[in-house]
């Protein structure tokens, strides 16, 4: 009796194990592909599965796979806008702020004078340049010590 019960238990466990290992493996999105060594003529290779198997997806779309639902159609007649608060909108992301106020700047640029409320533009002071600053120091040193190429050719002969 014990051997018979042990046999039934082993047979029951074997059926559970064989379902996982001998069934063809599924792959891709929503398990629509099958892992095979070589894809059939009606299938296309997409990517690799485990153990060097190819994920093959059928070229013929079957009805057993659920498709993505279509987007709902939006009718423009159904869209309405509420224009009741248009007058109170100031153009600022924060409510009740006035965008017409400008602040005095300490840097060079445009500032508002409080007496006349007119913008004034100030320019930065001009930078004075001298001949020493316009030429790089490496060029001035080499031009005084090295003769021009035509004179160099004459001196080496």
From Swiss-Prot:
Signal sequence bounds: 1-20
Skewed-composition ranges (Low complexity): 110-121, 129-145
S-S bonds: 27-55, 35-49, 39-56
Keyword set includes Metal-binding: no
UniProt keywords, alphabetically: Antibiotic, Antimicrobial, Defensin, Disulfide bond, Secreted, Signal
Subcellular location: Secreted
Name of one Pfam family that matches: Defensin_beta_2
Physiological role: Has antibacterial activity.
Protein name: Beta-defensin 125
Organism (species): Pan troglodytes (Chimpanzee)
Lineage, uppermost ranks: Eukaryota, Metazoa, Chordata, Craniata, Vertebrata
Gene label: DEFB125
């Amino acid at each position: 009796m014990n051997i018979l019960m042990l046999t039934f238990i082993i047979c029951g466990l074997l059926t559970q194990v064989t379902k996982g290992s001998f069934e063809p493996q599924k792959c891709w999105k929503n398990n629509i592909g099958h892992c095979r060594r070589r894809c059939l003529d009606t299938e296309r290779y997409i990517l690799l599965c485990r153990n060097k198997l190819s994920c093959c997806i059928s070229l013929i779309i079957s009805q057993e796979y659920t498709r993505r639902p279509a987007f709902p159609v939006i009718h423009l007649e159904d869209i309405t806008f509420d224009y009741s608060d248009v007058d109170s909108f100031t153009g600022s992301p924060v409510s009740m702020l006035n965008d017409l106020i400008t602040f005095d700047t300490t840097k060079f640029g445009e500032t508002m004078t409080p007496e006349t409320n007119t913008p004034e533009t100030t320019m930065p002071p001009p930078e004075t340049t001298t001949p020493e600053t316009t030429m790089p120091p490496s060029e001035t040193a080499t031009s005084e010590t090295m003769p021009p190429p035509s004179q160099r050719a004459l001196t080496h002969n």
